[in-house]
């Protein structure tokens, strides 16, 4: 037995060293032949020896105790980790149940899938082309993937309305009665053409806003909202998109061949198609709103078509001299200032400014600026107060500087031709019965009286106005329009 003891001890030590080495711990022997359980570490096999070693003397018992302590510590750690493992195993069924519940994003994807499926189904229906024509503008706009416009990047994009919201038709009810098509606001009739033209220049070719849409966006910008204007504008855009869908539904209902097929579709496909149309209209309206808010074409309207310019006023002269008017009123005054005069041969154009004295008898006309060249050496012909005019060409009217005693007069060229005046509310001509309202009608006393005698002093210092289409406009004397 005594001979077997050392052999068993050696085998146990070797086995314990292998176990300890595999576990990553090392045993450390101390000279006082004691090893604490907490700080017991195992050495590697290359540095450890059996009994009789020169480094460690008679430490077999310590080696055995260290092995047991390490094993006990490992078992304790394993026991501590067991509850956590059990908790994970318990949570697995709950995780499976949670995964079955689809999140909000998954529901959106599902709705989009139904919308795409509904669109494919509708494309196979008869007379689908009529339904597609009703929303062609919105479809063409979305085909461009809403890339930023090269002409609409100026401005602060921080105030834009973001279009990352998906709308749903299920949140509102249908009412196909009492819907009227969009029209131009009455307050915008005088300027809608120039503002619409300026809006087209800053929009992408795929947007193509109409005159009525331009008037609608213009009206939004004139809302007087102290707080949260963008939120109110967004709500208005959503309501307008819903209104567009209802109008599309009414058009489809008026088509006898399409409506029965629409009624036969299941509700899921119906709502899918309506969601698709609603978001198309909303995305297009948001796009136009952001471009209009950045560039404000209502403050810088485009000139009218240069083809409408009368003879003699071609070139770089603007069609209208427009001042900024933040209140949204038409900048056309109701009283004209002056008009461009022509010679007998129609070769000269002069800038003139009316200076009415207190007695109302004399006028002083001034030479034009250096840009205008007088080609004729003849004397300046006096202006007529009441020319006979007819035709389609028109010129805006402007208010003049005059004293309280001087009457308001309309000045027009003496050249017979097509000349009329456009005021804020109506188009006025001075040929008698064709004019419904004529606030500038002159008395018979001044019919044959010349406004500028040949002895009038003409000085360049008096020139402070700008030549425009058929008239002279003085921005420094601009006042709010007065109703006739």
Curated annotation (Swiss-Prot):
Where is there biased composition of kind Polar residues? 327-346, 418-428
What keywords does the record list, in alphabetical order? Glycoprotein, Host nucleus, Secreted, Signal, Virulence
Main localization is secreted
Show where the record puts the motif RxLR-dEER: 48-65
Region Disordered: what ranges?
324-463
User: Per the record, where are the segments of Low complexity compositional bias?
Assistant: 402-413
Q: Indicate which residues are glycosylated according to the record.
A: 175
* Compartment list: Secreted; Host nucleus
Give the GO cellular component terms, alphabetically.
Answer: extracellular region; host cell nucleus
> May I ask which residue range the UniProt record assigns to the signal sequence?
1-24
Keyword Transmembrane helix, does the record have it? no
Give the family from UniProt.
Belongs to the RxLR effector family.
- Role summary: Secreted effector that completely suppresses the host cell death induced by cell death-inducing proteins.
Report the domain remarks. The RxLR-dEER motif acts to carry the protein into the host cell cytoplasm through binding to cell surface phosphatidylinositol-3-phosphate.
Q: Identify this protein by name.
A: Secreted RxLR effector protein 104
Native organism is Plasmopara viticola (Downy mildew of grapevine)
Native organism taxonomy: Eukaryota, Sar, Stramenopiles, Oomycota, Peronosporales
Gene of this entry:
RXLR104
């Amino acid at each position: 037995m005594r001979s077997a003891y050392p052999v068993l001890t050696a085998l146990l030590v070797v086995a314990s060293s292998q176990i300890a080495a595999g576990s990553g711990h090392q045993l450390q022997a101390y000279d006082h032949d004691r090893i604490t359980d907490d700080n017991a570490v195992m050495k590697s096999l290359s540095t450890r020896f059996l009994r009789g070693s020169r480094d460690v003397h008679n430490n077999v018992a310590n080696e055995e105790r260290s092995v047991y302590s390490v094993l006990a510590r490992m078992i304790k750690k394993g026991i501590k980790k067991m509850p956590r493992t059990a908790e994970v195993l318990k949570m697995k069924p709950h995780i499976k149940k949670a995964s079955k519940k689809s999140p909000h994003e998954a529901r959106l994807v599902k709705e989009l899938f139904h919308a795409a499926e509904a669109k494919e189904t509708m494309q196979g229906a008869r007379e689908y082309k009529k339904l597609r024509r009703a929303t062609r503008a919105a479809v063409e706009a979305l085909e461009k993937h809403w890339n930023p416009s090269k002409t609409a990047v100026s401005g602060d994009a921080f105030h834009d309305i973001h279009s990352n919201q998906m709308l749903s038709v299920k949140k509102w009810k249908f009412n196909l009665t009492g819907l009227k098509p969009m029209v131009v606001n009455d307050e915008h009739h005088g300027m809608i053409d120039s503002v619409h033209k300026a809006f087209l220049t800053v929009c992408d070719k795929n947007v193509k806003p109409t005159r009525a849409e331009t008037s609608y966006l213009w009206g939004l910008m004139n809302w007087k909202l102290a707080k949260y204007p963008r939120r109110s504008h967004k709500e208005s855009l959503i309501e307008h998109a819903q209104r567009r869908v209802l109008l599309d539904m009414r058009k489809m209902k008026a088509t006898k061949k399409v409506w029965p097929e629409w009624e036969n579709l299941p509700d899921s496909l119906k709502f899918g198609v309506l969601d698709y149309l609603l978001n198309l209209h909303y995305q297009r309206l948001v796009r136009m709103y952001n471009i209009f808010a950045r560039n404000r074409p209502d403050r810088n309207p485009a000139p009218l078509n240069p083809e409408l310019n009368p003879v003699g006023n071609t070139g770089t002269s603007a069609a209208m001299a427009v001042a900024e008017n933040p209140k949204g009123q038409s900048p056309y005054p109701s009283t004209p200032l002056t008009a461009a005069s022509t010679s007998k041969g129609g070769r000269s154009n002069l800038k003139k400014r009316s200076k009415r004295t207190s007695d109302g008898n004399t006028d002083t006309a001034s030479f034009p600026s250096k840009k205008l060249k007088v080609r004729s050496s003849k004397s300046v012909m006096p202006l007529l107060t009441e020319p006979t005019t007819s035709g389609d060409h028109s010129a805006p009217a402007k208010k003049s500087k005059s004293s309280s005693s001087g009457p308001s007069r309309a000045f027009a060229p003496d050249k017979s031709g097509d000349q009329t005046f456009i005021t804020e509310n109506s188009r006025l001509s001075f040929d008698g019965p064709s004019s419904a309202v004529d606030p500038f009608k002159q008395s018979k006393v001044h019919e044959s009286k010349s406004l500028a005698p040949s002895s009038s002093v003409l000085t360049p210092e008096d020139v402070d106005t700008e030549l425009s289409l058929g008239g002279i406009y003085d921005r420094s004397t601009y006042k709010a329009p007065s109703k006739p």
